[in-house]
Regions:
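Short, structured coil segments at secondary-structure junctions
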Residues: 25-29, 117-118, 177
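A residue-level marker of the well-folded mature domains of exported/periplasmic proteins
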Residues: 111-118, 134-144, 204
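Alpha-helical, coiled-coil/dimerization segments enriched in small aliphatic residues
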Residues: 103-131
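Extracytoplasmic substrate-binding proteins
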Residues: 18-99, 123-124, 131, 187-243, ...
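Short, glycine/charged-enriched secondary-structure capping and boundary segments
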Residues: 23-25, 105-108, 164-165, 197-198
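Active-site/pore-lining binding-face segments in mid-to-C-terminal subdomains
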Residues: 147-212
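Acidic/His-rich segments in extracytoplasmic proteins that coordinate ligands and/or metal ions
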Residues: 2-55, 133-171, 252-259
Length: 262
């Protein structure tokens, strides 16, 4: 860090003592940011954006971004707010990143994209919040309840060798047997890509409610959100990355993990 001669250091590591120690060592301000459990939809994320706006004298831009996120959320919720509980499909979020890449057993019962999109999470009885692995037996037991599965792209490289050993590993999942398996972009490993978390919420909604989101094009959503966050449309560039596997899609269950893709 010293070789970069920074004027300020922005940290996402929420340890005040370590931040203070680094600040003393470097002799420049060290600012720590937090987002909270609801990721891009959390008020603490908004507070962090506002803080950055103040630091860099871009408060107007910060408020514009916060307003954009709120409008995107409202746009999703407006399409799903009237859906009765019994009409919500049960979806399994598969392979969430958690301090690195994981496999199909890493999930979350409080996955915020499902809550915002008004999607029923097939996992509901874990003992703690946040991303965590479930037992293989539990995954099997949940299989018949899965109307759809959404795989996080970060987990694909770890699932492929498991699938090579046992190509029947998903056969207990009704969603897999019926071809209702989908791929979202990786958004979290050690830290979070907040723009992707927002785009993934649109994809969760479109996956669960295709009729209500028929007019939503994921490339257009990706370009719109990356422009708001990063200043330019990036769908083509992101989808072209090897570990994006072509971007948002319904996957071919016969070939995707068998080595003919990715």
């Amino acid at each position: 860090i010293l070789t970069c001669e920074p004027d300020i250091v922005i940290s996402l590591y929420g340890d005040a003592d370590k931040a203070n120690a680094l600040q003393e060592q470097l002799g420049v301000p060290v600012v720590t940011l937090m987002s909270g459990p609801d990721s891009v939809f959390d008020e603490r994320f908004n507070e962090s954006v506002r803080l950055l706006g103040t630091i860099f004298e871009e408060s107007e831009k910060a408020e514009t971004l916060i307003g954009f996120i709120a409008a995107e959320r409202a746009g999703i919720e407006a399409r799903t707010a009237d859906i009765a509980e019994e009409d919500k499909p049960a979806v399994y979020i598969c392979g969430l990143g958690n301090w690195g890449t994981t496999n199909h057993l890493m999930t979350a019962q409080d996955y915020v994209s499902f809550r915002v999109a008004n999607v029923k999470n097939v996992v509901s009885d874990l003992g703690a919040p946040g991303a965590q692995p479930i037992e293989a037996e539990k995954f099997v037991a949940l299989g018949e309840d899965m109307d759809a599965m959404i795989f996080d792209a970060a987990a694909v490289k770890n699932i492929k060798p498991l699938y090579a050993e046992d190509p029947t590993m998903f056969d207990t999942c009704r969603a897999w047997r019926e071809g209702e398996a989908y791929l979202q972009l990786a958004y979290n490993a050690y830290y979070t890509n907040y723009e992707i978390a927002l785009i993934n919420t649109w994809f969760a909604a479109k996956t669960a409610y295709p009729d209500r989101f028929e007019d939503v094009d994921m490339t257009e959503v990706t370009d719109r959100v990356t422009t708001a966050f990063l200043g330019k449309p990036l769908a083509e560039e992101i989808y072209a990355c090897p570990n994006s596997f072509g971007g948002y899609q319904k996957i071919d269950t016969a070939t995707f993990f068998a080595g003919t893709q990715g």
